[in-house]
């Protein structure tokens, strides 16, 4: 199970590297259940979904605080990955991260293919540089594998087809809080009839019929800040020592450092 812990740490580091940010405009959270507050904290971002044309983000502003320099329009980062335990002792993780700079109206990132190992062996990782123009992913590195090349060029982020505006229908979640970080987690059982679940099943090799769990994680202030992150995961895993999930985040942070 060690490689699953390493994978979780790797994802957290990836998120901190590419999106140390709070998502969406800050919203005054009224006193109420933490479940409600967490959903409200996510709502401003998730209400933007689906973002069919990612270039629309050039004209959208997220939560701003004192970390932004005067005149900095900020940068959106969108990230989606699919992780699956295909072989005993191994975990395959594949996805894309894209940074959209609102100052220059340019979008650059990379597609990644990573394999984690339980025996302590260092992960195998390959990154392929990409950019986006006219809402189309353009591969900058040479890829000889035609299947992989097509997968990269036709890649769609979960946020481009997801519809999570009806968060209110998910209730009685399992909430956990660490006030020292602070961090907040809530989990909801999803139905296989959910359109988001159907979309994921049509796009990824999800072998189980098990209904997934929607996991919402926040590091940082619930009201929003440019320090911390928000992560959404739809987990299809059948067993504790296996992994089958899709992770998504959309964040807004200063573009100028």
UniProtKB/Swiss-Prot annotation:
The keyword Glycoprotein does not apply. It comes from the Bacteria. A lipid is attached at residue 23 (N-palmitoyl cysteine). Pfam families: DUF576 (PF04507). A lipid is attached at residue 23 (S-diacylglycerol cysteine). InterPro entries: Csa (IPR007595), Csa_sf (IPR038641). Residues 1-22 form the signal peptide. This is Uncharacterized lipoprotein SAR0439. It comes from Staphylococcus aureus (strain MRSA252).
């Amino acid at each position: 199970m060690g490689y699953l812990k390493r994978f979780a740490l790797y994802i957290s580091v990836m998120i901190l590297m590419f999106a140390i940010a709070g998502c969406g405009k800050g919203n005054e959270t009224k006193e109420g259940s933490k479940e409600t507050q967490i959903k409200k904290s996510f709502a401003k971002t998730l209400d933007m979904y689906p973002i069919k044309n990612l270039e629309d983000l050039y004209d959208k502003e997220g939560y701003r605080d004192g970390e932004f320099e005067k005149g900095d329009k900020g940068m959106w980062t969108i990230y989606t990955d699919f992780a699956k335990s295909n072989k005993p002792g191994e975990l395959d993780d594949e996805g894309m991260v894209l940074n959209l700079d609102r100052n220059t109206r340019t979008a650059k990132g990379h597609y990644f293919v990573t394999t984690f190992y339980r025996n302590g062996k260092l992960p195998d990782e390959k990154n392929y540089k990409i950019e986006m123009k006219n809402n189309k992913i353009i591969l900058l590195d040479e890829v000889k594998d035609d299947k992989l090349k097509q997968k990269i060029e036709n890649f769609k982020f979960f946020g481009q087809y997801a519809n999570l505006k009806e968060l209110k229908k998910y209730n009685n979640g399992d909430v956990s809080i660490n006030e020292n970080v602070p961090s907040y987690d809530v989990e909801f059982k999803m139905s296989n009839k959910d359109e988001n679940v159907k979309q994921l099943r049509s796009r990824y090799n999800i072998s189980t019929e098990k209904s997934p769990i929607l996991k919402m994680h926040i590091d940082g202030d619930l009201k929003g800040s440019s320090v911390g992150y928000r992560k959404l995961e739809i987990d299809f895993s059948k067993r504790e020592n296996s992994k089958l999930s899709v992770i998504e985040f959309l964040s807004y942070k200063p573009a100028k450092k």
